[in-house]
């Protein structure tokens, strides 16, 4: 599949209300903002590289009552429409969501202020997963390297500056996570931490199950824990993005499912970068009650 010139590696991000986004998304913004959510929609919300595919597979396994075969019905990106996704002439995320029967499970990377207003007015359920900023930064760097529809990230040192300044696609990690955290009690939001999911997947999966209004036997929950492990998902063609053309995601540069660990940032950050990041983190996150685990 050849990429149109405007989707070449040199693609520049555009902005909506100061938030950098991929150009086709911005060009399709009016359709995204007027999207009509339904009261029984469940929206999976994450900052990029925070366990989106993982939580999607968990939610789908719960929805399908642990039936692995049903979860193999199609690739994961087709099961839960990505509402801000746009790649003309293909159907947009909104088009795919509109064609889906209720109840719908959808996904987004949008910060709270850019979410289509109908999600709030319909009091939808939101499932948010947050990952510590350092690991998120590293994982996003490798994704930027292999993604052929994002700008070239440059060197790690260059990308470090881009990330801390919020100039990556979907904007600042700090603002994104804080935004969702601050409204968690005002709406139907289940706020989970990637690190908790790694530490005790069964407990966190049970939280998701209860949030979805499902009641599955313990043996089914144990099966879901096994089937949604990183090792299983990395080998699963329905979740590992191996079907995505190399012209979009070049997994010879870096695999889509790379490590899935906590603390990999220590293999990338210099001492000086870590000290600087900690200082910036204190400034930006000092006023919140958010606490992240940086290593297990």
Swiss-Prot record:
GO MF term set: aryl sulfotransferase activity; cholesterol sulfotransferase activity
Name used for this protein in its record: Sulfotransferase 1C2
Cellular localisation: Cytoplasm; Lysosome; Mitochondrion
Inducing stimuli: Down-regulated in kidney but not in stomach following feeding with 2-amino-4,5-diphenylthiazole.
BP terms from Gene Ontology: sulfation
UniProt keyword terms in alphabetical order: Cytoplasm, Lysosome, Mitochondrion, Phosphoprotein, Transferase
Phosphoserine modified-residue sites: 139, 254
Species of provenance: Rattus norvegicus
Keyword Phosphoprotein in record: yes
């Amino acid at each position: 599949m050849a990429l149109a010139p405007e989707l070449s590696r040199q693609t520049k991000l555009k902005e909506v209300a100061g938030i950098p986004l991929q150009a086709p998304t911005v060009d399709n913004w009016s359709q995204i903002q007027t999207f009509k959510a339904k009261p029984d929609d469940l929206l999976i919300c994450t900052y990029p590289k925070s366990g989106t595919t993982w939580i999607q597979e968990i939610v789908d396994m719960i929805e399908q009552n642990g039936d692995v075969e049903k979860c193999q019905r199609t690739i994961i990106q087709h099961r839960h429409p990505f509402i801000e996704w746009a790649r003309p002439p293909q159907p947009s995320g909104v088009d795919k969501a509109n064609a889906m029967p209720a109840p719908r499970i959808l996904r987004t990377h949008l910060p709270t202020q850019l979410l289509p207003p109908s999600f709030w007015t319909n009091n939808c359920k939101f499932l948010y997963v947050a990952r510590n900023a350092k690991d998120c930064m590293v994982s996003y760097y490798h994704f930027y390297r292999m993604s052929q529809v994002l700008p070239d990230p440059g060197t790690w040192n260059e990308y470090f500056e881009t990330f801390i300044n919020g100039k990556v696609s979907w904007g600042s990690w700090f603002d994104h996570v804080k935004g969702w955290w601050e409204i968690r009690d005002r709406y139907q939001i289940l706020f989970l931490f990637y690190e908790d999911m790694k530490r005790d997947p069964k407990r966190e999966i049970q939280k998701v199950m209860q949030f979805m209004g499902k009641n599955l036997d313990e043996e089914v929950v144990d099966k879901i824990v096994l089937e949604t492990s990183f090792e299983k998902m990395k080998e699963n063609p329905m979740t590992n993005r191996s079907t995505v053309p190399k012209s979009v995601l070049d997994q010879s540069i870096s695999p889509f499912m790379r490590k899935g660990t906590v603390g990999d940032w220590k293999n990338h950050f210099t001492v000086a970068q870590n000290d600087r990041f900690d200082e910036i983190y204190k400034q930006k996150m000092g006023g919140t009650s958010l606490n992240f685990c940086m290593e297990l």
